[in-house]
Amino acid sequence: MKKLHPTTQYKKDYKRFRNNREKLEKLMVILKMLQSETPIPAEFSPHMLTGNYAGYMECHIEGDFLLIWFDHETDQIDLVRLGSHSELFRQ
């Protein structure tokens, strides 16, 4: 079982959504999958990122509600960002 390590930025992002119970319930399902190394179903569009986030993974928890993480392939996964495309990828 992997350890989930939330970054400081992820914690800030999480606070913005803490009152949206529906989104957080879906997020918890994804986090449990990551922790137990269960493959994330295709319906969440898990994929590798490029550019500034090369090597990181992303999935669509709900519509435009995204999770970005980095899997160290040891026993730790860094939870990096949480939010919409415009929030996470603005130039």
Regions found by a protein language model. Name each.
Residues M33-H60:
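A short, surface-exposed loop/turn module that caps and links secondary-structure elements
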Residues F17-L24, E37:
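Residues at alpha-helix boundaries and the short loops/turns that link adjacent helices
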Residues L27, S45, G55, G63-F65, ...:
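A generic structural signal for short beta-strands and their flanking turns/coil linkers
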Residues Q9-D13, I30:
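A general alpha-helix detector
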Residues L24-M33:
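PIN-domain endoribonuclease scaffold, especially VapC-family toxins
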Residues K3, K12, N19-E22, C59, ...:
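Enriched for short, Lys/Arg-rich terminal
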